[in-house]
Amino acid sequence: MFMAENRLQLQKGSAEETIERFYNRQGIETIEGFQQMFVTKTLNTKDTDEVKILTIWESEDSFNNWLNSDVFKEAHKNVRLKSDDDGQQSPILSNKVFKYDIGYHYQK
């Protein structure tokens, strides 16, 4: 199994709105090899909010297929980083993707 983490640094106070965007999935569940998604808010941050999107996949290839899919492009077409040409300010200050091999998994 494989896990990808997309760690978002957000303007303070924007975590809940960002998390709510995930309530209506945009097709990730249709990608072969997708297994689970967790969207978390880091507690007790000072100057910014932090949201992590953790996705569990059958393999890294499955994740890469998601990144290269039309479904991914459609789901992310309205995501803005910092500010757009139209002057709209995005709550996303930065993001970083981390990749993990899952060596052990237990679920009750």
From Swiss-Prot:
Origin superkingdom: Bacteria
Site (Transition state stabilizer): residue numbering on this chain: W66
GO cellular component term, pick one: cytoplasm
Record's catalysed reaction(s): heme b + 5 AH2 + 4 O2 + 2 H(+) = delta-staphylobilin + Fe(2+) + formaldehyde + 5 A + 4 H2O; heme b + 5 AH2 + 4 O2 + 2 H(+) = beta-staphylobilin + Fe(2+) + formaldehyde + 5 A + 4 H2O
Enzyme class: oxidoreductase
Subunit organization: Homodimer.
Name the UniProt record assigns to this protein: Heme oxygenase (staphylobilin-producing) 2
Organism listed in the record: Staphylococcus aureus (strain MRSA252)
